[in-house]
C-alpha cells in the first residue's frame, strides 16, 4: 500500500498532539509506517495479516475484529467497524445507548475485541469433523515450517492412511495437496502485498529453494511468482 511522505508526516504530527487516531481495515498500514503502532496491539483484515506481520515486527498484531490500545484504534474492516463504533458509544454513553443504536441499525450481534475475525474451520470448509478441523488448524499455524502428514496424523491419533482417506472423503484431495494450497495462498498474498523478495517469500511459506517454489506456484496458478508480482504491480499503476 503506497503512502506519501506528506500523509505519514501528517499522521505523526497529529499523533504528537495526542489525538486519537484510528484506521479501518488496511488503513493500519500507513499508521504502522508512520510508527503510530509501534509497541501497540493492532489488527487488520485476515487477508493482510501475513504481509503486515512480515513488514511490521514492532506491532503486536492480533486476529481480533477490532482493537483499542490507548488512543490508537484499528479494525479488520467490513462490519467490524460497526462493532468498534458501538464500543466507543458504550464507553462514552453506556451499554444501553450502544444497544439502542445497534437495535436501530438491525445489528443483532455486537462483537467485542475478544472476538476473532474468521469463521471456524468447520464452518469454512463445510465439514464438521473434529480431527479434520484439528489437522487443518495445525497446517494453517505451521506454514513456514510444514509438518509432515505422518506427524499430523499421529498428533490427532490416526494413521497416515486414515488421514489420507479422511481428506479425500471430505475435501477431495490429499493432505499434502491441501497443505500445499494453503502455503501457495499465503505466498500469493505476500507477493502482492509486500516488497519481500521472491526468495524470502519462498522461505516464509516453507519452500527450501526458489526453484521448487516457482515450480509449485506455476503448477497451481499457471504463472511464475515473478510474473505474478510484475502483473500485479502493473495493474496497480493503471
Positions of predicted regions on the chain:
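Flexible gly/pro-rich beta->alpha loop and the following alpha-helix that scaffold active-site loops
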Residues: 1-20
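A conserved active-site-flanking secondary-structure segment within enzyme catalytic domains
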Residues: 37-65, 100-101
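Conserved anion/nucleotide-ligand pocket segment
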Residues: 64-106
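DNA-binding recognition helix and immediately preceding turn/loop
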Residues: 112-177, 194-205
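DNA-binding alpha-helical recognition surfaces that contact promoter or target DNA
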Residues: 165-166, 177, 189, 215-216, ...
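…primarily DNA-binding HTH/wHTH and HhH modules…
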Residues: 193, 204-238
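Short, basic, alpha-helical segments at the C-terminal edge of helix-turn-helix-like DNA-binding modules
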Residues: 43, 179-188, 227-238
